[in-house]
């Protein structure tokens, strides 16, 4: 089995792009407490929106879907799962809620990762929740002609418990040492987790739950207000491309994690920028039409009513609809299709 020692990251000479991304995120973290003092009730709306988006997007990445109406009902716990997809969506909802509410009390240990996986599959009848894989799994790639090939072979099942123990121990040791920036350490842990692929199913979703957990524990709570999973889903091609680049030669301990680190830092920074923009809109004393107009002016390309509602959580649905109609009549925006 390959070894895991994150102390080596301390000696890596990171390029200017990574250093610049880290510096910008540090700056936003410094302003984070100021953001959180603004209109708690409105910020709570951002939390509700982000929970729904995160639950929907993280599952959608894996092809687990239901209707927008059902997603909202499931996230609001106003209905029960009707099928396997909805069972797994409901499990993600619960696991994410557990992280939101109790991240300080979820240490990075194998036993807690297993418990989180158990929550993810608590509604499933498959009996795989909370257990490491018992059969060899593969990361496959489908070629243009439809042929499926094995792109990456994770660790064997018998190696998995020891490997997860090893990455947790090394991560905790380096976290305690404070010698490696968490923004570097966290993506390094996640790429190893994905390469180990410790479960029969749910590895991708668990990696995103763990990303949120690790960021929260390091003091980066932007994912509570702006969905990181949604940003990943919208850039899914880049997500998988950087994963593929960063897991190449992983089994030989010769992989380069730089592409995945850059991708994750870019995603976190984009979330902080969105958060600042939304807080700025919330702080203003503008009318509903002015808030919507401002949101529209700051949106590039096509957008939906839901996109605008996300940007102006202090404005009700009816007011957003009326404002968009007014802007359409004024010729500020054009409408495509219905809805």
Please tell me what each predicted stretch does:
Residues 1-339:
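FIC/Doc superfamily catalytic core
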